[in-house]
Swiss-Prot record:
InterPro entries: MnmA-like, MnmA-like_C, MnmA-like_central, MnmA-like_central_sf, Rossmann-like_a/b/a_fold. It comes from Brucella melitensis biotype 1 (strain ATCC 23456 / CCUG 17765 / NCTC 10094 / 16M). Transmembrane segments: none annotated. It is found in: Cytoplasm. This is tRNA-specific 2-thiouridylase MnmA. The keyword Ribosomal protein does not apply. One of its GO terms (cellular component) is cytoplasm. CDD domains: MnmA_TRMU-like. Keywords: ATP-binding, Cytoplasm, Disulfide bond, Nucleotide-binding, RNA-binding, Transferase, tRNA processing, tRNA-binding. The gene is mnmA. ATP binds at A20, M21, S22, G23, G24, V25, D26, S27, L46, G138.
Amino acid sequence: MSLNSLDLPGKPEDTRVVVAMSGGVDSSVVAGILKREGYDVVGVTLQLYDHGAAVHRAGSCCAGQDIEDARRVSESLGIPHYVLDYEARFREAVIDPFANSYVSGETPIPCVSCNQTVKFADLLQTARDLGADALATGHYIRSRANGAHRALYRPVDTDRDQSYFLFATTQEQIDYLRFPLGHLPKAQVREIAEELGLTVAKKQDSQDICFVPQGKYSDIISRLKPEAANPGDIVHIDGRTLGRHDGIVHYTVGQRRGIGVATGEALYVVHLDAANARVIVGPREALETHKVFLRDVNWLGDTPIADLPKSGMEVFAKVRSTRPPRPAVLRHADGQTWVELVDGESGIAPGQACVLYSDDSNAACVFGGGFIGRSEREPQAEEMLRRLMANADKASAA
């Protein structure tokens, strides 16, 4: 049997596709394209959080006006549309872990958790319950057949590359998901929205952290976890106490501005000592990192990660969503997985992701990745930090 444009057997009119509709232009265009091609399209929007603070805020998603926009687009396309209340699930799977991660001194990525749990687990099951052959989203990433399964690839428009946020997608989910925008530049997507007469054609793109009004994540965390706003010391990596802070929630590794001390030297946050409520700062060179240890690894490569050679596997690694993939070596031994960064990186924070690719082109295959549990700095900085932490432990035990 021949395959349709979604690589599924059968004619489009005999193929049901659930489209995850956030109310933005991207997912709306996905619904419009598939409807135009003759697919049996069903729109589903998740209400993910209390939208009171976001109803009049441009750049949110899955709340208030966005739900209404998704409904209007669905109505104009003539497709059924359902709104599912996932607020409790979103709080449990995304918001609470986000706050807990900050309290422990990490810098989390809630979008990965949302994709990993709510969107690509719970919504995927809902799509199956609706009898859909696939779940389509407006993410900028590509997938295509690779043997008996499908593999993920970076999109044509690398300025919109969302593969960093999708590294935790499992093989089973990848096989069921479809990403119709992966081969299109954003400008063309907006042109298609105009052609389709969609009311959201000129709508502003959504922000990454959708549930944080005005981007003030510290307000949300302080409300959920008041201990994150406990004051403490700002300490230089050489041991000097430089001042006080109003809560580690206001800081992240790599930060330079707004540290709150003036010493005449450029200082950066190099570590958050959550146990002792300390913000540890130092010179830029104290941020240089060549090795990161990963947890919760989702490996999509052909060779099982436990079977990697002792010499490791040459890959390209991305440690921030805004940075390109750079040369690295992936290693696994004694139950640990780590990545050696050939050229080094600065400002790597625990809780962030390290995503692995076959190369640095826009056709690169996504090998998966993991969350950064810890990193190793240059030897001198690593020793200074180790000594500082050991002294704090001794003081606490005394």
